[in-house]
Amino acid sequence: MKKRAFLLTSLSLIFTLGLNLISPAQARTLIPTDFRFFGSGYGHGVGMSQIGARGQALESKTAVEILNYYYPGTAVTAYPDDQLIRVNIANLISSVTLNAVGSTGEIRLYQGDIPMSESPEPFGIYSGDTTALFTNFAGSVVPALSSPTAKYAAINPAPAWTVRWDSATTTALLTNGVMATQYKYGQIVFKSVTNLLSSYLAVTNTLRLHDEYLYGLGEVPSSWPAAALEAQAIAARTYAIGKLSRLRVECDCNIYNTTVDQNFVGYAKETEAIYGIKWREAVNRTFVDENSALVVTLEGKPIQAFYFSSSGGVTQNVVEVWGSPVPYLTGVPDPWSLNPTINRRYALWSRFVPQSVMAQAFLLPDVVSFTINSRTQTGSISSITGISSTGASATLTGELFRAKVKLPSTWIHNTRAIVKLPFIAKECQVEIIERAKYCLT
């Protein structure tokens, strides 16, 4: 403690001497090289806190109790969920490859976007050692087949191609750049999507929502307590049902496989060592029968079941984040998110944001300082203004600022800028926020 105090005193003296060499006008226009932010939580903060669900499960709460807590006024009831859901698994790309995995694996190729209910004659059936490369070209998709044991003729392009396989013996391995993902269920469609500027390849996996889709969700660790896994499965099913009514043209999908919607990782979730079976069993426990399962409802209809990783201690009132009131998204205490034992990474975090990123976020030539204009009732920032050395300024909502500078959340407690000066490496601006004092050394 004495050594640290001496170091801080020395740094303060050096910093004061350094400033004496700089005129007041120069000091006022110093442009920070970085900004440091301290905060808590991860995600938008609306709906169910996943860390909170884990914390409550550790306190022996049931899945229904957890869901009723985070979505007050709702009920967990049986609801039909035997629909097919179309999941975008690769988008805005030019090409992708597919292989069959399995000792007796084979793939069946169909020309066109074939509905799951139809079983036409395939364009071709190919052995498991065949690699199929699908390339977008001028608004069409061109398949090219290769194999160490066979030669294939060129195939004419078509707007879309469908691939199926026998899920009892085979999985489909999709390779997009360096990312390779296995899919066990349903079918995969490769389609060319055209917008005003160009065309690109969109790849989708169509499968049953009830079980096949949920088995592949990688939203939380499978090692978590059973009640937390069940709550996650029910919330995810509810969210997905809300996406079924619209096919999005830009992705040829109902839902994305990323955290834009829900993190769908395919067969890898089920095959996790030791714990994969726990997630599958948790999903199964939420079934009511073959064609229906537990869903969060209000007046008999599925809710918008938003969820996120962790909060700054209280979940958000949705009206303060996205502008429209929702009766079951009004915010509740979430102390589990601030427990570092169960939220090691985000109970308290710090991030450096480079000057270039701050300037780009505010669309200013540079940022010398910023002002937090307002906060939500939970303490997260709702409005922030960046100020340039030119005197220009720009204002962003808290959520937009978080997205642009890639901070974990809008629960920002403390900030400081780092300025490179002659004789000193760092400037430390000390702020006391909620009795927390942070300083660089």
Residue ranges and their predicted role:
Residues 2-441:
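Conserved, single-site charged/polar hotspot
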